[in-house]
Amino acid sequence: MAKTIVVKQIGSPIRRPAIQRETLKGLGLNKMNRTRELEDTPAVRGMVAKIPHLAVIIEERG
């Protein structure tokens, strides 16, 4: 089984640059306090690292 991480949106994309809004969409997040379980890859971790004020990793599984 592949390792996964749980990512939670903690900030609003309102009044944020378009690239940050697109990064949230790429992670599958669109509303406050939503969570997604995603595959643990360098690409996903890099996306979360680019927007630490909007999304955080809350759990690592596997």
Swiss-Prot record:
From the UniProt record, which GO molecular function terms apply? structural constituent of ribosome
Q: Give the top-rank taxon of the lineage listed in the UniProt record for this protein.
A: Bacteria
Q: Which Pfam families match?
A: Ribosomal_L30 (PF00327)
User: Can you list the GO cellular component terms from the UniProt entry?
Assistant: cytosolic large ribosomal subunit
Q: What Gene Ontology terms for biological process does this UniProt record contain?
A: translation
Q: Which UniProt keywords apply?
A: Ribonucleoprotein, Ribosomal protein
Q: Quote the subunit structure annotation.
A: Part of the 50S ribosomal subunit.
User: Which family does the UniProt entry place this protein in?
Assistant: Belongs to the universal ribosomal protein uL30 family.
Q: Which NCBIfam families match?
A: rpmD_bact
Recorded protein name is: Large ribosomal subunit protein uL30
Which organism's genome codes for this protein?
Paracoccus denitrificans (strain Pd 1222)
